């Protein structure tokens, strides 16, 4: 950058023109800036991709949490479905934002990275080849002109110095004329000094003008050479600018979900789901399932009390699913209506390893039978929990009673056990046991407990796999035998 001197002002005035020596460096720096801008754009897209991913994850987590809350909450019916549709929208939008993230990183980011690698070539000594070529081109184009400019600056400085000396000499001569003590010889020297300064001024002026003329002659070529190198830099920068514009348009397409058909479909479906909510239908559903529209098992006359116990036992047996055992079906109540078949029910009875033979039946009241019927023969070791209505309605002699000696259904096993149909029989020994699993009583005579709870077994396991026990609270009831273990 050249500097001019103004005698009247006495300050330096600098020029910021491209044509000044060294001012081409801004154009060269633009090449390095282009490489840095590629990195900045990649970082920009990378951060946006991270935001898209984080937003997608937050949407998914939000949808998951609120789906569970709504499912477990009191909302019901079509409004619940409409509410759930909002969570479905979030999940689907989350997928779209993950696609945006993938597009930004896999397409746009990689595209910039590859272009940067192809456009800028690093050198072994540092910097880029393109930067060095531009630097060398400008330096070569500017070198002759810069040399002439240096000569002009030197000539200008010499001329300005000569002019100052001339003015100083003239001022001294004028002052000496007013001094009477100055002899003529000294005055003559001052006049000679003025003459010499005038000659120096003329000489430096000619040299200054000559240097300027030579500089002017080299300026056109200098401008042409500098323009040529500058245009090369412009072409390189134009490629970068056009590439950035192209990439940013691709980014816009990836970010603009409003043009994605599936995105529009998400909100169309959401609107339809919400509009499908029907308050009247929900109220009708609640009335039918939780209100006056529910069915009711109104109390009716019951013939005998033991029938309720039989139904309770059968209900509990139906709930138990044993891996092995004998399945009894078709419990028929007989008597005056022995010729009519009642609806059959399944009863699963676990097999007992101690039993050496299986149930043999010629007439089984627990099997679905035709109108002809057949006789029944039971193995002595089979202990049925309940007596079917068939046995209850048989005609017995007048002297028949509940006494075991006269009870035709009374049998004694090898160990001398008493009547297997007597539910009040106890094992005699109380044992402390610990629950292995959680169990929630399904009927009023069943116990409920959690895994790890301790209770007291007061009756051994029956043929259906149930034990009678007592909780520490004092409640007595039945529980599955395989849900506990004895405390050692």
Swiss-Prot record:
Regions of biased composition (Polar residues) lie at 329-364, 386-396, 406-418
Q: What happens when the gene is disrupted?
A: Reduces the density of caveolae.
Q: Where in the cell does this protein reside?
A: Cytoplasm; Cytoplasm, Cytoskeleton; Cytoplasmic vesicle membrane; Cell projection, Ruffle membrane
The cross-references to Pfam families, in alphabetical order and at most eight, read: FCH, SH3_9
Record PTM text: Phosphorylated by casein kinase 2 (CK2) and protein kinase C (PKC). Phosphorylation by PKC probably decreases the membrane binding and tubulation capacities of PACSIN2, thereby modulating the lifetime of caveolae.
What SUPFAM superfamilies does the record tag this protein with?
Answer: BAR/IMD domain-like, SH3-domain
Q: Which stretches does UniProt call biased (Basic and acidic residues)?
A: 163-176
Query: Which residues are in coiled coils?
Result: 25-274
Q: Which residues form the signal peptide?
A: none
Q: Which InterPro entries match?
A: AH/BAR_dom_sf, F_BAR, FCH_dom, PACSIN1/PACSIN2_SH3, PACSIN2_F-BAR, SH3-like_dom_sf, SH3_domain
Residues that bear Phosphoserine: 273, 315, 375, 401, 448
Per the record, what about its domains? The F-BAR domain forms a coiled coil and mediates membrane-binding and membrane tubulation. In the autoinhibited conformation, interaction with the SH3 domain inhibits membrane tubulation mediated by the F-BAR domain.
What name goes with this protein? Protein kinase C and casein kinase substrate in neurons 2 protein
């Amino acid at each position: 950058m050249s500097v001019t001197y103004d005698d009247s002002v006495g300050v330096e005035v600098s020029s910021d023109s491209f044509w000044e020596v060294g001012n081409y460096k801004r154009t060269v720096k633009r090449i390095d800036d282009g490489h840095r801008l590629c990195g900045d754009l990649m970082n920009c897209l990378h951060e946006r991709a991270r935001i898209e991913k984080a937003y997608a994850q937050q949407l998914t987590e939000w949808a998951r949490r609120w789906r569970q809350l709504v499912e477990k909450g009191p909302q019901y019916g079509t409004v619940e479905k409409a509410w759930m549709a909002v969570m479905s929208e979030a999940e689907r939008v989350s997928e779209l934002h993950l696609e945006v993230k993938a597009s930004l990183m896999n397409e746009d980011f990689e595209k910039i990275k590859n272009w940067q690698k192809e456009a800028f070539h690093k050198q072994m000594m540092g910097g880029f080849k393109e930067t060095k070529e531009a630097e060398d081109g400008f330096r070569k184009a500017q070198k002759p002109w810069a040399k002439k400019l240096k000569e002009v600056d030197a000539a200008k400085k010499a001329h300005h110095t000569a002019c100052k000396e001339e003015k100083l000499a003239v001022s001294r001569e004028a002052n000496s004329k007013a001094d009477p003590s100055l002899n003529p010889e000294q005055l003559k020297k001052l006049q000679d000094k003025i003459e010499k300064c005038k000659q120096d001024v003329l000489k430096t002026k000619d040299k200054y003008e000559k240097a300027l003329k030579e500089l002017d002659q080299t300026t056109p070529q200098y401008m042409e050479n500098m323009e040529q190198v500058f245009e090369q830099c412009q072409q390189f920068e134009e490629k970068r600018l056009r590439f950035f514009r192209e990439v940013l348009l691709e980014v816009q397409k990836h970010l603009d979900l409003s043009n994605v058909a599936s995105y529009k479909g998400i909100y169309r479906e959401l609107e339809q789901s919400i509009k499908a909510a029907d308050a009247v239908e929900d109220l009708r559903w609640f009335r039918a399932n939780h209100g006056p529209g529910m069915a009711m098992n109104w109390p009716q006359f019951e013939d005998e009390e033991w029938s309720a116990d039989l139904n309770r036992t059968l209900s509990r047996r139906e709930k138990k699913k044993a891996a092995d055992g004998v399945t009894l079906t078709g419990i028929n109540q007989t008597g005056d209506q022995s010729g009519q078949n009642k609806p059959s029910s399944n009863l699963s009875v676990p097999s007992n390893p101690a039993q050496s033979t299986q149930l043999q039946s010629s007439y089984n009241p627990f099997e679905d039978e035709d109108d002809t019927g057949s006789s029944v023969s039971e193995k002595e070791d089979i202990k049925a929990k309940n007596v079917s209505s068939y046995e209850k309605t048989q005609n017995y002699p007048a002297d028949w009673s509940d006494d075991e000696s006269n009870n035709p259904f009374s049998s004694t096993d090898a160990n001398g056990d008493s009547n297997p149909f007597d539910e009040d029989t106890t094992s005699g020994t109380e044992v402390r046991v610990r629950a292995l699993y959680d169990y929630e009583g399904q009927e009023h005579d069943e116990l409920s407990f959690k895994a790890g709870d301790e209770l007291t077994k007061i009756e051994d396991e029956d043929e259906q796999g149930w034990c009678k026990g007592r909780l520490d609270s004092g409640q007595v009831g039945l529980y599955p035998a395989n849900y506990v273990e004895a405390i050692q």
